[in-house]
């Protein structure tokens, strides 16, 4: 991912409160536009970098559960 894109995404949300961050995430997901995926990736990177090992394990369990094939 281009470093400039990473910085631009972070600059766009720096200082946002939880409600604003949630709106950004929900809007990006609901839009279904692939151009939003890099931004969501940057936000996930920030979450991952600031998460404890316990929180990382919980995220991985959630991700694994969400990616299991339908039975």
UniProtKB/Swiss-Prot annotation:
InterPro entries on file: SspI
Leader sequence residues: none
NCBIfam families the UniProt entry points to: SASP_sspI
Name the UniProt record assigns to this protein: Small, acid-soluble spore protein I
Subcellular locations according to the entry: Spore core
UniProt keyword annotation of Nucleus present: no
Pfam family, one: SSPI
Family classification: Belongs to the SspI family.
Predominant localisation class: other
Stimuli inducing this protein: Expressed only in the forespore compartment of sporulating cells. Disappears after 45 minutes of spore germination. Expression is sigma G-dependent.
HAMAP family from the UniProt entry: SspI
Alphabetic keyword roster: Sporulation
UniProt GO BP: asexual sporulation; sporulation resulting in formation of a cellular spore
């Amino acid at each position: 991912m281009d470093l400039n894109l990473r910085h631009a995404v972070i600059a766009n949300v720096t200082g946002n409160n939880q409600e604003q961050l949630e709106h950004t995430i929900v809007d990006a997901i609901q839009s279904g536009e692939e151009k939003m995926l890099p931004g969501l990736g940057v936000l996930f990177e920030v979450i991952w970098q600031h998460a404890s090992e316990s929180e990382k394990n919980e995220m991985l369990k959630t991700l694994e559960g969400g990616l299991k094939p339908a039975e």
